[in-house]
Amino acid sequence: MVIKRGFIGNTPKPSRCKRTKPIFREPNSPVNGGLVYNHPLHTAAAVKEAFSENRGFRTCHVCHRKNNMRLKVGTCESCKKHTCAICIRQCHKCESNVCSMCSKQERTFESEAFCPSCYPLDTY
């Protein structure tokens, strides 16, 4: 009888990666019992977002850059979200910090940009 390496009896031994790999099942499966491995709350992005406020790694909501020594993340006055120094700008009239997403709603008049609170929307 020849003993082959990596075999148990006549069947091949399962590889290590197949044994440790989680089994993906449907969430409503009776076999699963409510445990879901690929749930959106368990993804790396969700975990990173959950711990970003506590550890000081705030990300810009426009470009999603991290806060580091070179790039400071502030708060937009209009939408109250974290915005990096590249995506934030100042209103010429009131000197408030407005992000580039909110600045799309701005109106320009005589080559000066105003934030929505400074410039009335009904006048063109």
Curated annotation (Swiss-Prot):
Assigned keywords, A-Z: Cytoplasm, Nucleus
Main localization, broad class: cytoplasm
InterPro entries linked to this entry: Siva
Keyword Cytoplasm part of the UniProt annotation: yes
Protein name as catalogued: Uncharacterized protein C26H8.13c
Organism: Schizosaccharomyces pombe (strain 972 / ATCC 24843) (Fission yeast)
Domain of life: Eukaryota
A cellular component annotation (GO) from this entry: nucleus
Subcellular location: Cytoplasm; Nucleus
